[in-house]
UniProtKB/Swiss-Prot annotation:
Pfam families linked to this entry: Actin (PF00022)
Protein name (record): Actin-related protein T2
Alphabetical UniProt keywords: Cytoplasm, Cytoskeleton
Keyword Oxidoreductase recorded: no
Major site of localization recorded for this protein: cytoplasm
Transmembrane annotation, as ranges: none
Cellular localization per UniProt: Cytoplasm, Cytoskeleton
Family, as annotated: Belongs to the actin family.
């Protein structure tokens, strides 16, 4: 039985990502918890005497125990592909991270642009039937990121762990025909950086594992304004120091700007897709000519992979060459853009007007899974 008073409780927010899931409560300034989107299953079944031991581990605990586990991500390039594991991940977020009963509070879950219909309906089914949430809503990650910048019309450049996309939005609605996606993002840049470091001839006093290279990427990588000129600079101008876990200090050079270059030149990774600047231009030119100037004038960066120093300047420089003459271009790079989507969700679910947006358990019972197609857009 649906309890209408449940809508008076702060909503639970799950921002689902290939790298991390961010969880928290409506009205707060940021997510309470950020958990790696990983589920680990025991490689070997426990003897019967230990039958009560945990059969799977989630997030950082799974990564810590990875030698004894088979690790799986429920996401593939932003889309949910492992439903049993994503359910385990959500159960962990409800019970162990937030400590709330799913049946007590409404839930807003984020979704990638162009999320397939079957995924949207399956998510509603899992939340209502398996978790018993009183109300549910699905919202586009890019739209929420734009809300976090106090805009309802603009173009969002969203780049996270597994997908980079450009999403034009008009008056709060994404324009799906003009969305452009690139399967080059954070994890690909980390892998490329590792290859470049190993090929650079450096000898490293400790093993270069993914976690270490990821840390180097986040702390030292940058986007060059003019990549060819950057390669011709003297070594002492580009070298940066990094302190390894064992205390040794290493100096790193060109790989620090060569790895993020893959966002602008995906051909480095064998992709024939257009780079970031061409994606933005392509998305905007697919929109009605009446709003193209508005979109060029309200470009918002979102996601952890847009945090590279220099990315916004490079994007602006290339867009000025691609756009028609005298087109005003503005790029907003919010400092908290790793959490922009979550913050946008927190804002909208705090509005009293959002109450009428929720898909309630009664709605689900009456109309079935297809209700999300009519109500969540």
């Amino acid at each position: 039985m649906f309890n209408p008073h449940a809508l008076d409780s702060p909503a639970v927010i799950f921002d689902n990502g290939s790298g991390f899931c961010k969880a928290g409560l409506s009205g707060e300034f940021g997510p309470r918890h950020m958990v790696s989107s990983i589920v680990g299953h025991l490689k070997f079944q426990a003897p019967s005497a230990e039958a009560n031991q945990k059969k799977y581990f989630v997030g950082e605990e799974a990564l810590y125990k990875q030698e004894a586990l088979q690790l799986h991500s429920p996401f593939e390039r932003g889309l949910i592909t492992g439903w049993d594991d994503v359910e385990r991940l959500w159960k962990h977020l409800f019970e162990w991270e937030l400590g709330v009963k799913p049946s007590d509070q409404p839930l807003l879950a984020t979704e990638p642009s162009l999320n397939p219909r079957e995924n949207r309906e399956k998510m509603a089914e899992v939340m209502f039937e398996n978790f018993g949430v009183p109300a549910f809503y699905l919202s586009d990650q890019a739209v929420l990121a734009l809300y976090a910048s106090a805009c309802v019309t603009g173009l969002v450049v969203d780049s996270g762990d597994a997908v980079t996309c450009t999403v034009p939005i008009f008056e709060g609605y994404s324009l799906p025909h003009a969305v452009t996606k690139l399967h080059v993002a954070g994890r690909d840049i980390t892998e490329l950086l590792m290859q470049l470091l190993l090929a650079s001839g450096h000898t490293f006093p400790c093993q270069l594992d993914k976690g270490l290279v990821d840390d180097i990427k986040k702390k030292l990588c940058y986007v060059a304004l003019e990549p060819e000129k950057e390669l011709s600079r003297r070594p002492e101008e580009v070298l940066r120091e990094y302190k390894l876990p064992d205390g040794n200090i290493i100096s790193l050079g060109d790989p620090l700007h060569q790895a993020p270059e893959a966002l602008f030149v995906p051909q480095q990774l064998g992709s024939q897709s257009p780079g970031l600047s061409n994606m933005v231009s392509s998305s905007i030119t697919k929109c009605d000519t009446d709003i193209q100037k508005i979109l060029f004038g309200e470009i918002v960066l979102s996601g952890g992979t847009t945090l590279f120093h220099g990315l916004d300047d490079r994007l602006l420089k290339e867009l000025e060459q691609l756009a028609s003459k005298d087109t005003p271009i503005k790029i907003t790079a919010p400092p908290d853009r790793w959490f922009s989507t979550w913050i946008g969700a927190s804002i909208v679910t705090s509005l009293s007007s959002f109450k009428q947006m929720w898909v309630t358990a009664a709605d689900f019972k009456e109309f079935g899974t297809s209700v999300v197609q009519r109500r969540c857009f």
